[in-house]
């Protein structure tokens, strides 16, 4: 072995022992005729001192991030020199020999200083030597182990599903891989293991899980990755309560890795209530500021802006003192989200209403408004009007922004909820308008995905009354982040074909894209359901980090580029020829 102890393990009880450490030079300090280094490895840091002879002479060549092995005697630090900030702070190693295992070139950035993200990603192997990035990756491993432990205890089978499959319409663009042996044909990287895990239920596996890599070729979005990880689970012969209860066990074990005892069972809120009260299907419950319905209140208003299908409000406590420039900034906030602006009323200290909206209201509307919305003198009341979905989305975003500006969010709090009773379908036009992808060519598209089972009450009528149909779907939300989503699945061919038809997927297309699944359903498919957790997001929350890039060993930049390897990159003419990427498909090709 190149070392006998790890740097972070030394304690006063080890005094007098001869040890060999190996790691990196985190810092070097020259104190007259003595050189000190902080030697870092994965376990922590120990101070090493070079006092005399040849070993002191050798130490003069050490620089930051040299990889070294040191042998020496563990000693108690002189009085007054202890460092209470580190576990090894009471001891040091008096070096008797030094071996340089690897020299370091001049660093592109100092590891103990702030560096730009581009540099950090380009030299990610250096970035991961730092405490916070390195610990985030180690935490991820602990989280994986915690989840596996729970699932193993419930007789789950860990099964790997293919990462080279066929392209199916799942809501985002596929990454395509040319099939060299069938020129003109392509594999697709999976957006999720959805279809394969359902087939595993048909196969009688009953309890499946996988820490699965998924791929989606999406447009630039600030905190998305083209490849990401899910904890994917599926179970046969279960209802929604069974899936949610087991999911809660997994979450409790995962949050225990940071010392938090998650109280169970977790609360539940219906999709309709979440949208009505919080303007979001992933509500942040760490603070109040609920939306207030004002549609009926303004039913007879002469103010044209409020003559809309929906009018709602959210109150900003103390917001009446905002300067005009700040209030104008709220208009820009709304425009960035696709709205014309954000109406507001200021409540004076004497209760008088001012602002551009107030003058357009009737005396009766002004008289009762503060009581209706729950505002106090000194508050600002923001309004949105339009379709319920659009206006609530703006108010929900405003609610979050108000909470941030007023420092209402406890950063140490954990607020979980299940969102249940989801609509089975949404208008394809509304889905597209809000930035989602509408699968199929019909007027309606699946709210979750096409394989989500309707509730028993909606099964007979979902294709004649799609706007009222509910699905057996459930999302788990933590601190305003969707961290998992699942549902009971369709397991009958006739129901699945009706859903496809509802979405405008023709029988021919359904057979072409999903024929293997439809056929499987004819061989005694069991009722089944499952869930997929956004593993990157969960680990980021646990680590207290804002971006999922921080918890991925080698992430892509926001534009999907890897600064380290410079991927994606052009291919050679020979590779292009061999791949058959330019070949025209045969008669049976896609």
Curated annotation (Swiss-Prot):
Gene that this sequence comes from: aspS
Molecular functions per Gene Ontology: aspartate-tRNA ligase activity; aspartate-tRNA(Asn) ligase activity; ATP binding; nucleic acid binding
Pfam families the UniProt entry points to: GAD, tRNA-synt_2, tRNA_anti-codon
Complex formation: Homodimer.
UniProt protein name: Aspartate--tRNA(Asp/Asn) ligase
Database matches in InterPro entries: Aa-tRNA-synt_II (IPR004364), aa-tRNA-synth_II (IPR006195), aa-tRNA-synth_II/BPL/LPL (IPR045864), Asp-tRNA-ligase_1 (IPR004524), Asp-tRNA-ligase_1_N (IPR047089), Asp/Asn-tRNA-synth_IIb (IPR002312), AspRS_core (IPR047090), GAD-like_sf (IPR004115)
Enzyme class: ligase
Function description: Aspartyl-tRNA synthetase with relaxed tRNA specificity since it is able to aspartylate not only its cognate tRNA(Asp) but also tRNA(Asn). Reaction proceeds in two steps: L-aspartate is first activated by ATP to form Asp-AMP and then transferred to the acceptor end of tRNA(Asp/Asn).
Positions of L-aspartate binding: 170, 216, 448, 489
Coiled-coil parts of chain: none
Main localization (coarse): cytoplasm
Family as reported in the entry's similarity comment: Belongs to the class-II aminoacyl-tRNA synthetase family. Type 1 subfamily.
Binding-site positions, ATP: 216-218, 225, 482, 534-537
EC annotation from Swiss-Prot or TrEMBL: 6.1.1.23
